[in-house]
Amino acid sequence: MYGIEYTTFLIYLISIILFNYILKSITRMMDYIIYKFLLIVTITSIVVNAQNYGVNLPITGSMDTSYVNATKGKPFLTSTLCLYYPTEARTEINDNEWTNTLSQLFLTKGWPTGSVYFKEYDDIATFSVDPQLYCDYNIVLMRYNSNLELDMSELANLILNEWLCNPMDITLYYYQQTDEANKWIAMGQSCTIKVCPLNTQTLGIGCQTTNTRTFEEVATAEKLVITDVVDGVNHKLDVTTATCTIRNCKKLGPRENVAVIQVGGADILDITSDPTTNPQTERIMRINWKKWWQVFYTIVDYVNQIVQAMSKRSRSLNSAAFYYRV
């Protein structure tokens, strides 16, 4: 009897030892497989250097500021350049082949024939109503005129920045500007804008809400108006809506594929809204020549340096979106 019990006990003991050995062997094998898999994944991630685009990324408006200029140090073989100039330039040059001549000169700087487009506009006021910038790089030439300095500044502010605009129903609602980036932009053949600031009881401050003749006039018969009022205060507006479209706009950031070249003038245009900060003159340059041929020759000479200060990763500006966007 004792022999049978002793044998049974040995069998159980051997079974436990064997099971424990098998379990440890399986554990070591699983650890080896897991560690090897993690090592392979780590090495693969380093080698591939994979990037994840567009997964739960916040929408911030302008995308171009997060990219490095892709054209830096390379020929501009796949890019387009639009050169906007006033009618007076063509009139003064008086040569039917002048654009062909400039195209050949741009070719010497690495811009293939057909990649540079010459766009003419009548004057600053007309261009302000319908600015459309479609090329990868856009250079706008403005002849300085002391009588149009403020109009030039507003146009530069419009085209050098990206704006998100929504319609305004001024007949039904009051409006307020929330911060420095919030502006009211009006375009049209004739924009006259009056405002009446309101207190917390929606009563006019220095004006009568029922009498537009008591409103403060901030623009008179202009084609482009960027209106800035006191932030955080409701305003009732009066606008010549028959000849003007006004939008509530938010500045998203710089439109980095646009540069403004000022022809003449003592100082470069300043498009800064905040008087306490340094002048905002990014991508605003000045050329001091009397003759337009010399202006264009200078642009050809410095076109690549000008483009290096820009980036082609910006949205195209189409004023039709301003008028019809809902």
UniProtKB/Swiss-Prot annotation:
Example of a GO cellular component annotation carried by this entry: host cell endoplasmic reticulum lumen
Cleaved signal peptide residues: 1-50
Family: Belongs to the rotavirus VP7 family.
Record's comment on post-translational modification: N-glycosylated. The N-terminus is blocked possibly by pyroglutamic acid.
Oligomer status and interactors: Homotrimer; disulfide-linked. 2 Ca(2+) ions bound at each subunit interface in the trimer hold the trimer together. Interacts with the intermediate capsid protein VP6. Interacts with the outer capsid protein VP5*.
Region (CNP motif): 165-167
Miscellaneous comment as given in the Swiss-Prot or TrEMBL entry: Some rotavirus strains are neuraminidase-sensitive and require sialic acid to attach to the cell surface. Some rotavirus strains are integrin-dependent. Some rotavirus strains depend on ganglioside for their entry into the host cell. Hsp70 also seems to be involved in the entry of some strains. In group A rotaviruses, VP7 defines the G serotype.
GO molecular-function terms, A-Z: metal ion binding
Function: Calcium-binding protein that interacts with rotavirus cell receptors once the initial attachment by VP4 has been achieved. Rotavirus attachment and entry into the host cell probably involves multiple sequential contacts between the outer capsid proteins VP4 and VP7, and the cell receptors. Following entry into the host cell, low intracellular or intravesicular Ca(2+) concentration probably causes the calcium-stabilized VP7 trimers to dissociate from the virion. This step is probably necessary for the membrane-disrupting entry step and the release of VP4, which is locked onto the virion by VP7.
Keyword Transcription part of the UniProt annotation: no
Glycan attachment sites: 69
UniProt name for this protein: Outer capsid glycoprotein VP7
Transmembrane segments: none
Start and end residues of each stretch annotated as LVD motif: 237-239
A Pfam family assignment: VP7
Binding-site list for Ca(2+) 2: 177, 228-229, 231, 301
Binding sites annotated in the UniProt record for Ca(2+) 1: 95, 206, 214, 216
Compartments where found: Virion; Host endoplasmic reticulum lumen
